[in-house]
């Protein structure tokens, strides 16, 4: 933890931590390396409503699960757009682009195939991941070194109960306000809605949402699906009747949605991404 940053524990169960990081001052990644790397990597963007970044249930737990299956995982702690950064609403995308390029640049050291790097995002981190998978070519920061000559395009994208649309009738209100303000013009809403900005060479997508999600409406995943289909981009969509929001990899209990990591793994293997 750097000065001004804060980690808050939200769980009363020491065996089941649920920490968040607030006021991130320097973006960075936590790396989970498999005993025997299989060549695939996943950049993980946890959620937090653009208010904070979740550490455990959408970050470290997922990283450990992936590493146990031979996938090198990088959990991204990205800067938050409402905290005065010069990049404003592009700051998390800048951090995600930089992370993707650093992973690609360091592929030899990590035992990674540079063409097998995907991104996975949860909730507001789903917006970060979708923004990267659609806006990887946007120039949102000044190049720093040789890594920035590489592509930031992920080879696949998995969005788990994602924030997508910035339209007032569909958006998660807190994420929208912290990203683009309380009363943004329609052009700004569109510019920061990945479903309306899908390029022709976007990677394949995996979408997951519970229809009873009362935090981020399932319409967000459906809007992303429609945007991808309109551009001819491959997309696997998994909807579950029950699950709510924020269940991560291990907190859906006995509900059918608890099986989603295996569904993702099957999809990723079919894409050559796991």
What is the meaning of each model-derived region?
Residues 3-5, 9-16, 146, 162-197, ...:
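Mobile cap/lid helix-loop segments that gate and shape the active-site cleft of serine hydrolases
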Residues 54-56, 61-62, 76-114, 253-258:
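Catalytic nucleophile-loop/oxyanion-hole region of alpha/beta-hydrolase
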Residues 201, 206-209, 213:
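Short beta-strand/loop motif that positions the catalytic acidic residue
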Residues 208, 218, 222-274:
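C-terminal catalytic histidine-bearing segment of alpha/beta-hydrolase fold enzymes
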């Amino acid at each position: 933890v750097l000065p001004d940053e804060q980690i808050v524990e939200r769980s009363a169960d020491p065996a089941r931590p649920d920490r968040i990081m607030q006021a991130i001052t320097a973006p960075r990644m936590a790396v989970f390396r498999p005993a025997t790397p299989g060549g695939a990597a996943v950049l993980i963007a946890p959620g937090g409503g653009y208010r904070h970044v979740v550490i455990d249930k959408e970050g470290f737990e997922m990283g450990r699960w992936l590493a146990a299956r031979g996938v090198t995982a990088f959990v991204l702690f990205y800067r938050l757009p409402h905290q005065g950064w010069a990049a404003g609403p592009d700051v998390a995308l800048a951090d995600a682009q930089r992370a993707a390029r650093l992973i690609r640049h360091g592929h030899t050291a990590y035992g990674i195939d540079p063409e097998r790097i995907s991104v996975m995002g949860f909730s507001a981190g789903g917006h970060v991941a979708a923004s990267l998978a659609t806006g990887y070519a946007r120039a949102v920061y000044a190049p720093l070194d040789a890594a920035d000559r590489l592509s930031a395009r992920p080879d696949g994208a998995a969005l788990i109960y994602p924030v997508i649309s910035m339209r007032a009738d569909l958006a998660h209100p807190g994420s929208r306000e912290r990203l683009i303000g309380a009363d943004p013009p329609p052009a700004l809403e569109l510019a920061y809605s990945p479903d309306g900005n899908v390029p022709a060479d976007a990677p394949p997508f995996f979408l997951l949402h519970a229809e009873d999600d009362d935090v981020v409406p399932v319409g967000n995943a459906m809007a992303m699906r429609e945007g991808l289909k309109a551009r001819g981009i491959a997309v696997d969509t998994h909807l579950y009747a029950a699950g709510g929001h924020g269940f991560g990899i291990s907190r859906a209990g006995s509900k059918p949605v608890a099986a989603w990591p295996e569904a993702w793994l099957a999809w990723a293997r079919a894409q050559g991404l796991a």
